Amino acid sequence: AYDCIQIHGGSGFMLEYACQRIYRDARITSIYEGTTQLQTVAAIRYVTNGSYAATLRDYETIPCSEEMQPLMDRLKEMTNKFEAVTNATKEAANQELLDFVARRLYEMAAVCVMSHLLIQDATKAPELFAKSAVVYLNYAEAEVEKHFNFIRKFKAEELESYRK
């Protein structure tokens, strides 16, 4: 949410954008939940039950401008990677493994959601958001790739190396 606001914040009054609500809720959630780990625990159920993937697929059905279509195509591939590692983690049926990769999974979901919001805004107001959409999608794609590779290559047997 903070990354999304940084991009939108430069264009003026942020109450006009969907990410304003996400930013506001993220700040409140931090106060009430206490720690990022508790937020991870709360969010991971929606990652593993397919809610975030379904939301991302719904966002894909929202038309975007011709200029934003190449970004949308890249974003669809990012969602494919998110779904692939989410499904692989669920299929492993290892709670410790899920706990270990949970934050990476929800970070993948988060950057995909924020990318969709930017593409939607860039479609409506390209003069304000087109460049930001390109910049943020480059960042988000790198983050998804990083987490995708880590989760895909990680073996449950390696968990021992991460314990105290």
Each model region followed by its residue ranges:
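Flavin-dependent oxidoreductase catalytic core characteristic
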Residues: 1-164
